[in-house]
From Swiss-Prot:
Residues spanning the signal sequence: none
Family stated for the protein in its record: Belongs to the ribonucleoside diphosphate reductase small chain family.
Provenance organism: Mus musculus (Mouse)
Subunit structure: Heterotetramer with large (RRM1) subunit. Interacts with p53/TP53. Interacts with RRM1 in response to DNA damage.
Gene that encodes the chain: Rrm2b
Subcellular localization(s) per the UniProt record: Cytoplasm; Nucleus
Residues where Fe cation 2 binds: E131, E194, E228, H231
Taxonomy, superkingdom: Eukaryota
Protein name, entry field: Ribonucleoside-diphosphate reductase subunit M2 B
EC number of this enzyme: 1.17.4.1
Record region (Disordered): 1-24
Residue numbers annotated as active site: Y138
GO cellular component labels: cytosol; mitochondrion; nucleoplasm; ribonucleoside-diphosphate reductase complex
Length: 351
Protein backbone atom coordinates (compact mmCIF):
# COMPACT_ATOMS: atom_id res chain seq x y z
CA UNK A 1 0.00 0.00 0.00
CA UNK A 2 1.36 3.40 -0.95
CA UNK A 3 4.45 1.91 -2.69
CA UNK A 4 5.61 4.48 -5.24
CA UNK A 5 7.13 1.71 -7.38
CA UNK A 6 5.10 0.62 -10.38
CA UNK A 7 4.50 -3.04 -11.30
CA UNK A 8 7.39 -4.65 -13.14
CA UNK A 9 5.20 -5.61 -16.10
CA UNK A 10 4.23 -1.98 -16.69
CA UNK A 11 7.81 -0.80 -17.19
CA UNK A 12 9.13 -0.04 -20.70
CA UNK A 13 12.65 -0.81 -21.86
CA UNK A 14 15.34 1.05 -19.89
CA UNK A 15 16.34 3.55 -22.61
CA UNK A 16 12.75 4.22 -23.58
CA UNK A 17 11.83 4.58 -19.90
CA UNK A 18 14.51 7.20 -19.22
CA UNK A 19 13.53 9.21 -22.29
CA UNK A 20 9.80 9.16 -21.58
CA UNK A 21 10.31 9.96 -17.90
CA UNK A 22 12.56 12.92 -18.75
CA UNK A 23 10.04 14.30 -21.22
CA UNK A 24 7.21 13.76 -18.77
CA UNK A 25 9.11 15.52 -15.98
CA UNK A 26 9.85 18.52 -18.24
CA UNK A 27 6.15 18.83 -19.06
CA UNK A 28 5.26 18.61 -15.37
CA UNK A 29 7.81 21.28 -14.46
CA UNK A 30 6.60 23.68 -17.13
CA UNK A 31 3.02 23.32 -15.91
CA UNK A 32 3.91 24.09 -12.28
CA UNK A 33 4.75 27.73 -11.39
CA UNK A 34 6.77 26.48 -8.41
CA UNK A 35 8.95 24.28 -10.63
CA UNK A 36 9.23 26.40 -13.78
CA UNK A 37 12.82 27.45 -14.48
CA UNK A 38 13.44 31.18 -14.57
CA UNK A 39 16.38 33.54 -14.05
CA UNK A 40 14.19 35.16 -11.37
CA UNK A 41 15.17 32.30 -9.07
CA UNK A 42 18.50 34.03 -8.40
CA UNK A 43 16.92 37.20 -6.95
CA UNK A 44 14.65 37.38 -3.91
CA UNK A 45 13.01 40.80 -4.34
CA UNK A 46 10.38 41.79 -5.25
CA UNK A 47 8.54 39.13 -3.24
CA UNK A 48 6.16 37.20 -5.49
CA UNK A 49 4.84 34.77 -2.85
CA UNK A 50 4.28 36.75 0.39
CA UNK A 51 2.77 33.81 2.30
CA UNK A 52 5.76 31.59 1.49
CA UNK A 53 8.10 34.43 2.48
CA UNK A 54 6.23 34.90 5.79
CA UNK A 55 6.79 31.24 6.64
CA UNK A 56 10.49 31.64 5.91
CA UNK A 57 10.64 34.62 8.27
CA UNK A 58 8.77 32.63 10.94
CA UNK A 59 11.31 29.84 10.62
CA UNK A 60 14.13 32.37 10.84
CA UNK A 61 12.64 33.96 13.96
CA UNK A 62 12.36 30.61 15.74
CA UNK A 63 16.02 29.65 15.29
CA UNK A 64 17.73 28.03 18.26
CA UNK A 65 20.88 26.04 18.98
CA UNK A 66 21.63 22.87 20.93
CA UNK A 67 23.69 24.94 23.39
CA UNK A 68 20.48 26.63 24.60
CA UNK A 69 19.18 23.35 26.07
CA UNK A 70 20.27 22.63 29.64
CA UNK A 71 20.81 18.88 30.14
CA UNK A 72 22.38 19.14 33.60
CA UNK A 73 19.23 17.98 35.42
CA UNK A 74 18.50 15.08 33.10
CA UNK A 75 21.12 12.58 34.26
CA UNK A 76 19.75 12.21 37.83
CA UNK A 77 16.32 11.56 36.28
CA UNK A 78 17.78 9.14 33.74
CA UNK A 79 19.51 7.12 36.43
CA UNK A 80 16.19 6.69 38.28
CA UNK A 81 14.22 5.51 35.24
CA UNK A 82 13.15 1.89 34.89
CA UNK A 83 15.03 -0.21 32.36
CA UNK A 84 11.96 -0.30 30.05
CA UNK A 85 11.78 3.50 30.11
CA UNK A 86 15.49 3.83 29.31
CA UNK A 87 15.11 1.34 26.47
CA UNK A 88 12.17 3.24 24.98
CA UNK A 89 13.73 6.70 25.23
CA UNK A 90 17.11 5.65 23.84
CA UNK A 91 15.53 3.89 20.87
CA UNK A 92 13.23 6.84 20.12
CA UNK A 93 16.26 9.14 20.16
CA UNK A 94 18.07 6.75 17.82
CA UNK A 95 15.18 6.95 15.35
CA UNK A 96 15.11 10.74 15.53
CA UNK A 97 18.89 11.08 15.14
CA UNK A 98 18.72 9.26 11.80
CA UNK A 99 15.47 10.79 10.56
CA UNK A 100 16.55 14.42 10.35
CA UNK A 101 19.40 13.41 8.06
CA UNK A 102 16.92 11.69 5.75
CA UNK A 103 14.70 14.79 5.66
CA UNK A 104 17.76 16.85 4.74
CA UNK A 105 18.77 14.42 2.02
CA UNK A 106 15.39 14.94 0.39
CA UNK A 107 15.72 18.72 0.67
CA UNK A 108 19.22 18.74 -0.82
CA UNK A 109 18.77 16.04 -3.47
CA UNK A 110 15.23 16.80 -4.61
CA UNK A 111 13.14 19.72 -3.32
CA UNK A 112 15.83 22.43 -3.36
CA UNK A 113 16.78 21.45 -6.90
CA UNK A 114 13.25 21.12 -8.21
CA UNK A 115 11.61 24.21 -6.73
CA UNK A 116 12.53 27.40 -8.60
CA UNK A 117 10.73 29.97 -6.44
CA UNK A 118 13.34 31.91 -4.39
CA UNK A 119 11.02 32.41 -1.40
CA UNK A 120 10.58 28.63 -1.10
CA UNK A 121 14.27 28.02 -1.62
CA UNK A 122 14.95 30.37 1.30
CA UNK A 123 12.64 28.28 3.48
CA UNK A 124 14.25 25.01 2.42
CA UNK A 125 17.71 26.45 3.05
CA UNK A 126 16.73 27.42 6.57
CA UNK A 127 15.00 24.08 7.11
CA UNK A 128 18.24 22.30 6.23
CA UNK A 129 20.01 24.41 8.87
CA UNK A 130 17.49 23.68 11.63
CA UNK A 131 17.31 19.96 10.76
CA UNK A 132 21.07 19.89 11.37
CA UNK A 133 20.43 21.45 14.79
CA UNK A 134 17.82 18.76 15.51
CA UNK A 135 20.22 16.01 14.50
CA UNK A 136 22.94 17.51 16.68
CA UNK A 137 20.51 17.76 19.60
CA UNK A 138 19.44 14.11 19.36
CA UNK A 139 23.04 12.96 19.04
CA UNK A 140 23.96 15.07 22.08
CA UNK A 141 21.10 13.53 24.08
CA UNK A 142 22.29 10.01 23.24
CA UNK A 143 25.86 11.00 24.04
CA UNK A 144 24.74 12.40 27.42
CA UNK A 145 22.52 9.52 28.56
CA UNK A 146 24.35 6.49 27.17
CA UNK A 147 27.76 5.98 28.70
CA UNK A 148 28.57 2.57 27.18
CA UNK A 149 30.41 3.19 23.86
CA UNK A 150 29.06 -0.01 22.27
CA UNK A 151 25.45 0.84 23.12
CA UNK A 152 26.01 4.37 21.88
CA UNK A 153 27.39 3.10 18.57
CA UNK A 154 24.41 0.73 18.25
CA UNK A 155 22.01 3.65 18.65
CA UNK A 156 23.89 5.94 16.26
CA UNK A 157 23.61 3.22 13.59
CA UNK A 158 19.88 2.63 14.12
CA UNK A 159 19.06 2.39 10.41
CA UNK A 160 21.34 -0.65 10.20
CA UNK A 161 20.85 -2.12 13.69
CA UNK A 162 17.09 -1.69 14.30
CA UNK A 163 14.73 -3.29 11.75
CA UNK A 164 11.75 -1.12 12.77
CA UNK A 165 13.76 2.08 12.35
CA UNK A 166 15.04 0.77 9.02
CA UNK A 167 11.45 0.17 7.86
CA UNK A 168 10.51 3.82 8.45
CA UNK A 169 13.78 5.04 6.93
CA UNK A 170 13.36 2.85 3.85
CA UNK A 171 9.86 4.24 3.27
CA UNK A 172 11.18 7.81 3.25
CA UNK A 173 14.32 6.99 1.26
CA UNK A 174 12.27 5.23 -1.40
CA UNK A 175 10.42 8.49 -2.09
CA UNK A 176 13.71 10.35 -2.50
CA UNK A 177 15.00 7.78 -5.00
CA UNK A 178 11.75 7.44 -6.94
CA UNK A 179 11.95 9.28 -10.28
CA UNK A 180 8.43 8.48 -11.43
CA UNK A 181 6.37 10.00 -8.65
CA UNK A 182 5.15 13.57 -9.01
CA UNK A 183 6.44 16.46 -6.94
CA UNK A 184 2.99 16.64 -5.32
CA UNK A 185 3.13 13.01 -4.22
CA UNK A 186 6.54 13.55 -2.65
CA UNK A 187 5.38 16.72 -0.88
CA UNK A 188 2.60 14.63 0.69
CA UNK A 189 5.01 11.81 1.56
CA UNK A 190 7.43 14.10 3.39
CA UNK A 191 4.59 15.94 5.09
CA UNK A 192 3.68 12.46 6.37
CA UNK A 193 7.26 11.85 7.51
CA UNK A 194 7.38 15.08 9.52
CA UNK A 195 3.70 15.17 10.48
CA UNK A 196 2.97 11.48 11.16
CA UNK A 197 6.24 9.56 11.57
CA UNK A 198 7.36 12.04 14.25
CA UNK A 199 4.00 12.68 15.93
CA UNK A 200 3.71 9.63 18.17
CA UNK A 201 7.29 9.93 19.36
CA UNK A 202 6.78 13.61 20.17
CA UNK A 203 3.66 12.68 22.16
CA UNK A 204 5.56 9.99 24.06
CA UNK A 205 8.21 12.49 25.14
CA UNK A 206 5.53 15.02 26.12
CA UNK A 207 4.07 12.23 28.26
CA UNK A 208 7.37 12.21 30.16
CA UNK A 209 7.05 15.98 30.61
CA UNK A 210 3.60 15.48 32.12
CA UNK A 211 5.28 13.21 34.68
CA UNK A 212 7.89 15.88 35.44
CA UNK A 213 10.77 13.90 33.97
CA UNK A 214 13.82 14.82 31.89
CA UNK A 215 13.50 18.62 31.59
CA UNK A 216 16.27 18.96 28.99
CA UNK A 217 14.86 16.23 26.77
CA UNK A 218 11.31 17.55 27.02
CA UNK A 219 12.36 21.16 26.37
CA UNK A 220 14.27 20.16 23.25
CA UNK A 221 11.20 18.15 22.23
CA UNK A 222 9.11 21.34 22.45
CA UNK A 223 11.52 23.21 20.21
CA UNK A 224 11.81 20.43 17.66
CA UNK A 225 8.10 19.60 17.52
CA UNK A 226 7.30 23.25 16.79
CA UNK A 227 9.91 23.36 14.03
CA UNK A 228 8.53 20.19 12.48
CA UNK A 229 5.02 21.58 12.74
CA UNK A 230 6.07 24.63 10.76
CA UNK A 231 7.76 22.40 8.17
CA UNK A 232 4.57 20.39 7.84
CA UNK A 233 2.53 23.58 7.47
CA UNK A 234 4.94 24.70 4.76
CA UNK A 235 4.50 21.43 2.87
CA UNK A 236 0.73 21.98 2.95
CA UNK A 237 1.19 25.54 1.65
CA UNK A 238 3.38 24.31 -1.21
CA UNK A 239 0.77 21.67 -2.00
CA UNK A 240 -1.93 24.33 -2.33
CA UNK A 241 0.12 26.09 -5.02
CA UNK A 242 0.34 22.99 -7.22
CA UNK A 243 -1.61 23.01 -10.47
CA UNK A 244 -1.53 19.23 -10.92
CA UNK A 245 -2.22 17.82 -7.48
CA UNK A 246 -2.34 14.07 -6.89
CA UNK A 247 -5.85 12.68 -6.57
CA UNK A 248 -7.56 12.49 -3.18
CA UNK A 249 -7.40 8.69 -3.36
CA UNK A 250 -3.63 8.82 -3.94
CA UNK A 251 -3.08 11.26 -1.08
CA UNK A 252 -5.20 9.16 1.27
CA UNK A 253 -3.24 6.07 0.21
CA UNK A 254 0.10 7.70 1.07
CA UNK A 255 -1.20 9.00 4.42
CA UNK A 256 -2.83 5.69 5.38
CA UNK A 257 0.41 3.87 4.59
CA UNK A 258 2.37 6.20 6.88
CA UNK A 259 -0.23 5.76 9.64
CA UNK A 260 0.04 1.98 9.47
CA UNK A 261 3.84 2.08 9.72
CA UNK A 262 3.78 4.57 12.63
CA UNK A 263 1.13 2.61 14.54
CA UNK A 264 3.13 -0.58 14.15
CA UNK A 265 6.29 1.23 15.28
CA UNK A 266 4.82 2.57 18.55
CA UNK A 267 2.46 -0.26 19.51
CA UNK A 268 4.35 -3.37 18.40
CA UNK A 269 8.02 -2.75 17.55
CA UNK A 270 8.66 -0.16 20.27
CA UNK A 271 5.42 -0.12 22.28
CA UNK A 272 4.63 3.00 24.29
CA UNK A 273 3.44 0.64 27.02
CA UNK A 274 7.11 0.57 28.05
CA UNK A 275 6.69 4.06 29.51
CA UNK A 276 3.15 3.53 30.80
CA UNK A 277 1.20 4.93 27.85
CA UNK A 278 -1.89 3.27 26.40
CA UNK A 279 -1.15 1.66 23.01
CA UNK A 280 -4.78 1.82 21.86
CA UNK A 281 -4.91 5.55 22.56
CA UNK A 282 -1.58 6.04 20.79
CA UNK A 283 -3.04 4.42 17.67
CA UNK A 284 -5.98 6.80 17.93
CA UNK A 285 -3.68 9.79 18.36
CA UNK A 286 -1.76 8.92 15.20
CA UNK A 287 -5.07 8.69 13.32
CA UNK A 288 -6.10 12.08 14.73
CA UNK A 289 -2.85 13.64 13.49
CA UNK A 290 -3.32 12.04 10.07
CA UNK A 291 -6.87 13.41 9.80
CA UNK A 292 -5.61 16.87 10.70
CA UNK A 293 -2.92 16.67 8.02
CA UNK A 294 -5.48 15.58 5.42
CA UNK A 295 -7.60 18.59 6.35
CA UNK A 296 -4.63 20.93 5.91
CA UNK A 297 -4.04 19.42 2.48
CA UNK A 298 -7.65 20.12 1.57
CA UNK A 299 -9.08 16.61 1.78
CA UNK A 300 -11.64 14.82 3.93
CA UNK A 301 -10.71 12.79 7.00
CA UNK A 302 -10.17 9.04 6.91
CA UNK A 303 -10.46 8.07 10.57
CA UNK A 304 -12.72 10.71 12.19
CA UNK A 305 -10.50 10.37 15.28
CA UNK A 306 -10.56 12.61 18.35
CA UNK A 307 -7.40 13.63 20.23
CA UNK A 308 -7.21 11.12 23.12
CA UNK A 309 -4.36 12.87 24.94
CA UNK A 310 -5.43 15.89 26.97
CA UNK A 311 -1.80 16.85 27.59
CA UNK A 312 -1.36 17.33 23.83
CA UNK A 313 -4.21 19.84 23.53
CA UNK A 314 -1.88 22.77 24.13
CA UNK A 315 0.96 21.28 22.15
CA UNK A 316 0.58 22.46 18.59
CA UNK A 317 2.41 20.93 15.67
CA UNK A 318 1.67 24.14 13.79
CA UNK A 319 4.49 26.30 15.12
CA UNK A 320 2.15 28.70 16.93
CA UNK A 321 2.58 27.93 20.63
CA UNK A 322 3.66 30.20 23.45
CA UNK A 323 7.33 29.37 23.11
CA UNK A 324 7.37 30.16 19.41
CA UNK A 325 5.55 33.44 19.97
CA UNK A 326 8.00 34.29 22.73
CA UNK A 327 10.86 33.67 20.33
CA UNK A 328 9.21 35.85 17.72
CA UNK A 329 8.79 38.71 20.20
CA UNK A 330 12.45 38.40 21.22
CA UNK A 331 13.62 38.50 17.64
CA UNK A 332 11.34 41.44 16.91
CA UNK A 333 13.97 43.53 18.70
CA UNK A 334 16.26 42.72 15.79
CA UNK A 335 13.46 43.29 13.25
CA UNK A 336 13.58 39.71 11.97
CA UNK A 337 9.81 39.67 11.42
CA UNK A 338 9.42 43.34 10.51
CA UNK A 339 8.17 44.50 7.14
CA UNK A 340 10.84 46.27 5.08
CA UNK A 341 8.73 49.44 5.20
CA UNK A 342 9.01 49.38 9.00
CA UNK A 343 12.77 49.94 8.89
CA UNK A 344 13.22 53.67 9.44
CA UNK A 345 16.66 55.20 9.96
CA UNK A 346 16.82 57.86 12.68
CA UNK A 347 19.55 59.76 14.53
CA UNK A 348 17.67 60.39 17.79
CA UNK A 349 18.36 57.08 19.55
CA UNK A 350 19.58 57.17 23.17
CA UNK A 351 23.21 56.13 23.61
Amino acid sequence: MGDPERPEAARPEKGEQLCSETEENVVRSNEEPLLRKSSRRFVIFPIQYPDIWRMYKQAQASFWTAEEVDLSKDLPHWNKLKSDEKYFISHILAFFAASDGIVNENLVERFSQEVQVPEARCFYGFQILIENVHSEMYSLLIDTYIRDPKKREFLFNAIETMPYVKKKADWALRWIADRKSTFGERVVAFAAVEGIFFSGSFAAIFWLKKRGLMPGLTFSNELISRDEGLHCDFACLMFQYLVNKPSEDRVREIIADAVQIEQEFLTEALPVGLIGMNCVLMKQYIEFVADRLLGELGFSKIFQAENPFDFMENISLEGKTNFFEKRVSEYQRFAVMAETTDNVFTLDADF
